[in-house]
Every structure is written in structure tokens, then in C-alpha cells.
Curated annotation (Swiss-Prot):
Transmembrane segments: none annotated. Belongs to the universal ribosomal protein uS13 family. One of its GO terms (biological process) is translation. It comes from the Bacteria. It holds the Pfam family Ribosomal_S13. GO terms for molecular function: rRNA binding; structural constituent of ribosome; tRNA binding. Part of the 30S ribosomal subunit. Forms a loose heterodimer with protein S19. Forms two bridges to the 50S subunit in the 70S ribosome. Residues 95-121 are annotated as: Disordered. It comes from Campylobacter jejuni subsp. jejuni serotype O:23/36 (strain 81-176). Located at the top of the head of the 30S subunit, it contacts several helices of the 16S rRNA. In the 70S ribosome it contacts the 23S rRNA (bridge B1a) and protein L5 of the 50S subunit (bridge B1b), connecting the 2 subunits; these bridges are implicated in subunit movement. Contacts the tRNAs in the A and P-sites. The gene is rpsM. Keywords: Ribonucleoprotein, Ribosomal protein, RNA-binding, rRNA-binding, tRNA-binding. Gene3D superfamilies: 1.10.8.50, 30s ribosomal protein s13, domain 2 (4.10.910.10). One of its GO terms (cellular component) is small ribosomal subunit. This is Small ribosomal subunit protein uS13.
């Protein structure tokens, strides 16, 4: 099993899809990396030689922000929005949808379980 950027890639998958298991790498980026390194998309992860795996590791390490670093950067960006007091930051702080969705009836994922208000018995 190839280990790239701290992630064990599934052995039987094609390398172009295997790389998408790394946080921050989608299909487009995966193909871009493989083109640059010169590896066929159809090659399976378990068929990679150690040199090819090292080349992929080097390409990702030098040119892409992935896994922990990317997660940390995203968290810092959200924290900066909250500290600024911007509208988006306030929505993050309140746990509401940030991108303009309506909240009267939907938004259950962000708002959580329903809280009944004013139920009289």
C-alpha cells in the first residue's frame, strides 16, 4: 500500500482515483500531478514503483498544500472572518448557512436538531 502525504492509498484503485483520498486533491489535481510526473492514469496503486511513488510525493510536497496544512489554513481563514466581524464570520459564529441560503424552513445540517419554542400544554 502506497503512503503519500500521510495517507494510505487503496491498493486496487487506479492511481488517478487513489490520489483523491488525500485531502485537498481532487480528480483534476490528481491528473495534473500524474501528467507532470509522467505516470499513466490507468496504473493501479499497487503497480507503482518506489521511484514513481517518490516522484508523486515530491510533486505534492513542493507544489500543493494538502492534509493537515490545508485543514489548518481553512480553519485560520474562517477564524479570521469571525475576528473581522464580517457577515460571513457572524454566520459561521452563529452556526448558520454562510452562502445566502434561506433558513426559515431548511438549513437543518447547520442549525442542528430542532428546538421547539413556545410549546404550551
Amino acid at each position: 500500500m502506497a503512503r503519500i502525504a500521510g495517507v494510505d492509498l487503496p491498493k486496487k484503485k487506479r492511481i488517478e482515483y487513489g490520489l483523491t483520498y488525500i485531502y485537498g486533491i481532487g480528480l483534476f489535481t490528481s491528473r495534473k500531478i500524474l501528467d507532470k510526473v509522467g505516470i499513466s492514469y490507468n496504473k493501479r496503486v499497487h503497480e507503482l514503483s518506489e521511484d514513481e511513488a517518490a516522484a508523486i510525493r515530491k510533486e505534492i510536497q513542493e507544489n500543493y498544500m494538502v492534509e493537515g496544512d490545508l485543514r489548518k489554513q481553512v480553519a485560520m481563514d474562517i477564524k479570521a472572518l469571525m475576528d473581522l466581524g464580517s457577515f460571513r464570520g457572524l454566520r459561521h459564529r452563529k452556526g448558520l448557512p454562510v452562502r445566502g441560503q434561506k433558513t426559515k424552513t431548511n438549513a437543518r445540517t447547520r442549525k442542528g436538531k430542532r428546538k421547539t419554542v413556545g410549546a404550551k400544554s
